[in-house]
A protein has these predicted regions:
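Active-site environment of divalent metal-dependent phosphoester hydrolases
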Residues: 44-46, 77-82, 101-112, 164-167, ...
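Extended active-site neighborhood of metal-dependent phosphoesterases/phosphodiesterases
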Residues: 86-196, 293-298
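N-terminal active-site segment of His-dependent metallophosphoesterases
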Residues: 20-87
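Active-site-proximal beta-strand elements of phosphoester/diester hydrolases
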Residues: 32-45, 153-162, 205, 272-278
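Positively charged n-region of N-terminal signal peptides that target proteins for export
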Residues: 1-4
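Bacterial N-terminal signal peptides
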Residues: 7-16
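Binuclear metal-dependent phosphoesterase catalytic core
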Residues: 38, 143-145, 150, 241-248, ...
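His/acidic metal-ligating clusters that form di-metal
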Residues: 65-67, 155-157, 170-263, 329-334
Length: 338
């Protein structure tokens, strides 16, 4: 019994030591911070159909060398879920890249609860999520420090969008709760006050798209860039997270997964509603070659560049927020004679 306890303590200390070695997230000397988003990996441990997903993850990380990796849900798709989760996340840990995970609706269907999987994720080196604190799967906000390390320069909100509706007369997927909306409002207000009354530039990451994705995609005047091959499978009920973010004024864009045949981005009332790129193999429906979304933030500016990276280093749909999604005033264009 003593040997088991000692081994457990050593493993725990080793994990804590690795966690302690992760430097604070910070803009580099060029004022840039790069994020890679992987989504809907649907990894099945030991299934050859998932090999291409792991290969693509490795290729993207080696090519982009990001400052942070965000896995936006449906990471694992078969038991053993804990082993599968560790395998996928090892591609970040082996490269010593900080990472976080937001759960999808399928992650806890493989024999492990959200709480159990959260603890597995937290035990991995270079994971920077907070402790659960008794909550099954907490929401959290990551701060990006300025390039000189002296102040908070940007925020990343990471939310659990849950799984399925718990109301018998409401079908489909679950929604962000009022408690989550209130939590976001409180966090945003606190950072705004700390920043002299100015909202910090922010992004949000979660799995299931908000209902506003369908509103924006159906607007004939909206500029939609990327691929849209299916309607957003959003919750039937709208609890106001988009409105809260619009009112707070910090979130520039939100990034989701869930719908494998979408990778588009569209502006809606000043906020970019974007999908990641399906990263998985042929273990679930898909009609897009797998890849990842990359986001490059700029310090001190409400702008970012984003693109999709695919097999063999191919880059598509490179856009700049907000400029790529806004129509210019044609009356002010310089005279063109040819």
């Amino acid at each position: 019994m003593k040997k088991i306890s000692l081994a457990f303590c050593l493993a725990l200390l080793s994990s804590l030591f690795c966690l302690a070695q992760v430097s604070p997230l910070q803009f580099n000397k060029n004022g840039e911070f790069k994020i890679v988003q992987f989504t809907d990996i649907h990894f099945k441990y030991g299934n050859p159909a998932s090999d291409i997903a792991l290969k693509r993850i490795g290729e993207v990380l080696d090519a982009e060398r990001p400052d942070l990796v965000v896995f936006t849900g449906d990471v694992v798709y078969a038991a053993p879920a804990d082993t599968a989760m560790r395998k996928v996340l090892s591609y970040a840990t082996d490269r010593k890249i900080p990472f976080v995970v937001t759960f999808g609706n399928h992650d806890n269907e493989q024999g492990k609860t959200r709480a159990e999987l959260y603890d597995v994720i937290r035990s991995m080196p270079f994971n920077i999520q907070p402790d659960r604190g008794g909550v099954e799967s907490p929401d959290y906000v990551l701060t990006l420090k300025s390039s000189d390390g002296k102040k908070d320069a940007a925020l990343l909100y990471c939310l659990d969008s849950h799984s399925y509706s718990k109301l018998p007369d409401v079908k489909g997927y679950d929604w962000l709760t009022f408690d989550q909306v209130n939590w976001y409002r409180q966090q945003s207000a606190a950072y705004k006050a700390k920043n002299g009354g100015q909202p910090l530039p922010a992004l949000a990451f979660f799995h299931i798209p908000l209902p506003e994705y369908n509103e924006a995609a159906s607007d004939e005047n909206a500029i939609l860039l990327g691929t849209r091959m299916e309607k957003a499978c959003a919750p039937e009920l709208n609890t106001g997270m988009f409105t809260a973010m619009k009112e707070a004024g910090d979130v520039m864009g939100m990034f989701v997964g869930h719908d494998h045949d979408n990778d588009y981005a569209v502006m809606w009332k000043g906020i970019l509603l974007a999908y990641g790129r399906f990263t998985g193999g042929n273990t679930e429906y898909n009609h897009l070659s797998n890849g990842a979304r990359v986001i490059l933030m700029k310090e001190g500016a409400r702008t970012f560049t984003t693109w999709i990276r695919l097999k063999g280093g191919e880059i598509i749909d490179k856009t700049v927020y907000p400029d790529s999604y806004m129509k210019d005033d044609w009356r002010k264009r310089p005279l063109v004679t040819e």
